[in-house]
Regions:
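Long, distal/terminal scaffolding or interaction modules
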Residues: 1-193
Length: 193
């Protein structure tokens, strides 16, 4: 296992180091002191395992096709952007626009997520993306969704926070959203009423 201390390390230098090590045959990574570094795991096609201690920045696992990433804390926005395959597990909360255009793979978030999660998700070349939220989600969940599965469990959400916000499934024309709990009709987009 390769351990990298990312304290003070620019995101370009971190990602260059990871990709060079993957090209050299390394497959197990443990990243310490991650503090907002962007693009970790982006475009990686090899079957690698990356464990992150800290909070990764935007676009974690974007265009990813095979790796497994485990985040021990929270994550910022755009996790799994246009992800093709692989698995991302976040043991905390995550930000906005998770799973944007996700075409395959699995994304698990223990806590709450922000706005526009699952926007433009689609099934692609026989793959069905799966996005599971342990807490709650804010507005525009599954907006313009064309395929895939979103599940919101509501088990780990903050007190006084609804299961989902407004406009769930707005523009949705494929895929399925499962919500564990009550949702008012006014919270749903007209396409899913």
């Amino acid at each position: 296992m390769i351990e990298i201390d990312a304290k003070g390390l620019h995101y370009r230098d971190l990602n260059r180091r990871i990709k060079n090590l993957i090209r050299a045959g390394e497959r197990e990574f443990y990243l310490h002191n991650i503090n907002g570094q962007r693009y970790i795991g982006d475009g990686v096609k090899e079957k690698v395992n990356i464990t992150i201690d800290g909070v990764p920045g935007n676009d974690l696992g974007a265009f990813m096709d095979g790796p497994r990433i485990v985040v021990k804390n929270n994550a910022q926005d755009a996790v799994a952007n246009t992800m093709n395959s692989g698995e991302i597990i976040i043991h905390g909360d995550a930000g906005d626009v998770l799973g944007y255009g996700m075409r395959g793979g699995r994304l698990f978030i223990r806590g709450d997520v922000g706005y526009r999660v699952g926007i433009h998700m689609k099934a692609y070349q026989g793959k069905t993306p799966l996005l599971i939220v342990g807490g709650g989600a804010m507005d525009f969940l599954g907006e313009y969704m064309a395929g895939g599965i979103i599940i919101v469990l509501g088990m780990n959400r903050r007190k006084n926070r609804p299961l989902v916000g407004s406009f769930v499934g707005t523009g949705m024309h494929g895929g399925v959203i499962y919500l564990r709990g009550e949702v008012e009709p006014h919270q749903l987009g007209k396409e899913v009423k």
